């Protein structure tokens, strides 16, 4: 179920404050965050946000096409290494 429009998008307060400070100064630095559920809003465009995936912070450069998506969508938590190869020698 999606979030009600009258509530507006969820963005962590600490993350939004950091973005607004950087926009006022005009600086571009990587902002580390653990808030994967925060929605990408227009003030974030052009910033690089380090999104935690459970092991490390993955840098995500925010573009205008990402607005409305969540930060966690761009930081995969699972590593897929492929299925096991067929071992013909083991079958003999």
UniProtKB/Swiss-Prot annotation:
Any single GO BP term: translation
Gene: rps19
Protein name in UniProt: Small ribosomal subunit protein uS19c
Gene3D superfamilies reported in the protein's UniProt record: 30s Ribosomal Protein S19, Chain A
Annotated region (Disordered), positions in chain: 73-92
Keywords carried by this UniProt record: Chloroplast, Plastid, Ribonucleoprotein, Ribosomal protein, RNA-binding, rRNA-binding
PANTHER family membership: RIBOSOMAL PROTEIN S19P FAMILY MEMBER (PTHR11880), SMALL RIBOSOMAL SUBUNIT PROTEIN US19M (PTHR11880:SF8)
Name of one Pfam family that matches: Ribosomal_S19
Source taxonomy: Eukaryota, Viridiplantae, Chlorophyta, core chlorophytes, Chlorophyceae
């Amino acid at each position: 179920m999606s979030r009600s429009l009258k509530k507006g998008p969820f963005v962590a307060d600490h993350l939004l404050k950091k973005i607004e400070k950087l926009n006022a100064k005009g600086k571009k630095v990587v902002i580390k965050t653990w808030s994967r559920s925060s929605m990408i809003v227009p003030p974030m465009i052009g910033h690089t946000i380090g999104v935690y995936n459970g092991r490390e912070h993955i840098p995500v450069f925010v573009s205008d096409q990402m607005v409305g998506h969540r930060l966690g969508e761009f930081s995969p938590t699972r590593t897929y290494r492929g299925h096991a190869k067929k071992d013909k020698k083991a079958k003999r």
